[in-house]
UniProtKB/Swiss-Prot annotation:
Listed cofactors: Zn(2+)
Zinc in keyword set: yes
InterPro entries xref list: MBL_superfamily_lactonases, Metallo-B-lactamas, RibonucZ/Hydroxyglut_hydro
A family per Pfam: Lactamase_B
Family of the protein in this entry: Belongs to the metallo-beta-lactamase superfamily.
Binding site for Zn(2+) 2: 116, 213, 259
Keyword Hydrolase: yes
Protein name (Swiss-Prot/TrEMBL): N-acyl homoserine lactonase AiiB
Native species: Rhizobium rhizogenes (strain K84 / ATCC BAA-868) (Agrobacterium radiobacter)
Cofactor note: Binds 2 Zn(2+) ions per subunit.
Residues the record lists as binding Zn(2+) 1: 111, 113, 191, 213
Amino acid sequence: MGNKLFVLDLGEIRVDENFIIANSTFVTPQKPTVSSRLIDIPVSAYLIQCTNATILYDTGCHPECMGTNGRWPAQSQLNAPYIGASECNLPERLRQLDLSPDDISTVVLSHLHNDHAGCVEFFGKSRLIAHEDEFATAVRYFATGDHSSPYIVKDIEAWLATPRNWDLVGRDERERELAPGVNLLNFGTGHASGMLGLAVRLEKQPGFLLVSDACYTATNYGPPARRAGVLHDTIGYDRTVSHIRQYAESRSLTVLFGHDREQFASLIKSTDGFYE
């Protein structure tokens, strides 16, 4: 049996377009006043069913991220609110596939921001793969009580409340096979302190390269490549986008971007089918 890839729709986040494409709008002497544009970007996760493993790439936002008692700080809720019906949260999307978090053997976390690692706490029996530098960054925000970033202190507190099977990828480990046709890629620093991708080969088509926020959209990808508005390391980001292009083109893989509205709308969602 070959690999199957399910695309999980986990709702949307409403953001200033400049967060996604840097300098999307800017003032000039000729146009001293320019209005920014709000856009709704998809939040997603990907489930890969293999012969001997069930792998999840990212976990979306926590179901209780919003509201007066929500996980996210008030400023985060104002700046980039989450929008999603109850059926869009990750545990519910898994239930729709007759799965529970306990059925997931491995969770690959592209990075540990609020819209990608919000549901980590539900996976007490899974191996959790994260970049060692990204893990250290998240724990530092938790330890210092710093609520100013996309690393959510209340989420991290829940992760660390009980022992978990963390598998941290070192800086020098570039690639690792997780299952036949499924390879973990270490993109290193860029959008965040440590980004991980996933290459998934399929039987009926070449497959996909899942890159998450290492490259938000096709516009960021180019060519010419354009930087995102939220970056930890600009040089690392540029290097990563070039590496993604070389890796995908040399293997005929389709790049699935982190928050591309048009691309995501075109994909078959888990409620309607899968890729194989």
